[in-house]
C-alpha cells in the first residue's frame, strides 16, 4: 500500500512544483493528435505502463482482479492532474487518498 501511496505523493509534489503545466500526455491526446498523430503512441504507452504498474501493486496487496481498480485509479490520477492544472491548490491529496483506500478495502472484501 505504501508504494501506491508514494505514486500519489509524487503527483502531489509534481502539482506543487513551479514548472507544473499539466500532463504532456493528456495535452498530446487532446490538442496535438490531429496535427501529429505520432503523439498517440507515447501517450498510450505511458498510460499502459502506469496502469500495469498499479495493477502489480494492487496484486501485491491482495486484490484478486486488479485490472478494473487499476484503471479507475489511473482515471483518478488523470482527473487530479486536470484539476491541478486549472487550480493547483484545489487538489486535497489526503481526501483523494482516503477514497482510494476505501476502494481498495471494498475490493479486498469482495468474495
Task: Describe these PLM feature segments.
Residues 12, 51, 55, 101-104:
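Structural signal for well-ordered, non-membrane alpha-helices
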Residues 8-11, 25-29, 73, 77-80:
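Short alpha-helical scaffolding segments that buttress acidic/His motifs in well-ordered protein cores
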Residues 8-9, 37-40:
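Short alpha-helical transmembrane interface motifs in multi-pass membrane proteins
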